């Protein structure tokens, strides 16, 4: 079983490209196998097509983006705004975790601007937690594996929580060298340009990603483009406080010293 395996579990088609594709590409360059799993079909992402047509369109776009990232693709398991934290869906997510057998799981922030993101996060965390619990049955059935898993949470959309408080990254990944490839993968989601213009006032989803990437880079104090991450508590996931992203990415990974000081005060 290859320990160099990373799994991104996000809500909608294009969420991975917005928040995590740069980190995945850097891992891929370092010989990691990367896995791409959106839980939702994206069926709500259009004011021009009906739900089934939108879902089919977005499935093709996501598959194209995953190929661009050289990632293994897993199909969605629910529709937009219909995701709930149920044991049935947890069994589905846990099956993908066991199939991918990741050392690193990337997912949404625990608190984000919409429920789909937060429920995806909860399912991803519980599925990762269950990776070494053979008595928890997955759907389809997959064997448990016994290796450390570390979960990292992306920064929330807009870099703040739903009550508008800024959210600080624990660590920054330098995505400058892969930013154009990340942008190209996001551009594969062509159907989203009009939808995001109308629904969320994004002048361009590509420009919005560029701006967020540069802002996170600015916050890093070091990188032009960056993605920010916070590491989940290791209890139940690994034997000790490990940081495999740091170990894998070296100089492209910068820990925010002020965040680390805050952890020392609270633990």
Model-derived segments and spans:
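Metal-dependent de-N-acetylase/amidase catalytic core
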Residues: 1-7, 85-267
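Active-site rim/loop-helix segments in enzyme catalytic domains that contact anionic ligands
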Residues: 1-100, 130, 239-248, 261-264
């Amino acid at each position: 079983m290859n320990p160099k395996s990373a799994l991104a579990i996000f809500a909608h088609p294009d969420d991975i490209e917005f928040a995590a594709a740069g980190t995945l590409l850097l891992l891929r360059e370092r010989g990691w196998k990367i896995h791409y799993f959106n839980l939702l079909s994206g069926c709500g992402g259009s004011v021009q097509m009906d739900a089934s047509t939108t879902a089919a369109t977005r499935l093709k776009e996501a598959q194209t983006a995953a190929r661009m990232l050289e990632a293994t693709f897993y199909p969605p398991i629910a529709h937009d705004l219909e995701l709930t934290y149920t044991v049935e869906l947890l069994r589905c997510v846990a099956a993908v975790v066991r199939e991918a057998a990741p050392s690193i799981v990337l997912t949404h922030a625990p608190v984000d601007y919409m429920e789909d993101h937060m429920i995806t996060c909860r399912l991803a965390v519980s599925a990762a937690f269950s990776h070494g619990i053979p008595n928890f049955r997955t759907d389809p059935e997959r064997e448990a594996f016994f290796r450390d898993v570390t979960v990292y949470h992306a920064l929330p959309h807009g870099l703040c929580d739903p009550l508008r408080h800024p959210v600080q990254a624990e660590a920054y990944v330098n995505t400058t060298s892969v930013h154009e490839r990340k942008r190209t993968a996001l551009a594969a989601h062509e159907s989203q340009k009009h939808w995001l213009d109308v629904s969320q006032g994004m002048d361009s989803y590509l420009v919005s990603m560029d701006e967020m990437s540069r802002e996170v880079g600015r916050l890093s104090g070091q990188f032009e483009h960056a993605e920010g991450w916070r590491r989940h508590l290791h209890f139940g996931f690994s034997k000790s406080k490990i940081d495999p992203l740091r170990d894998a990415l070296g100089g492209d990974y910068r820990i925010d010293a002020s965040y680390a000081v805050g952890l020392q005060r609270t633990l």
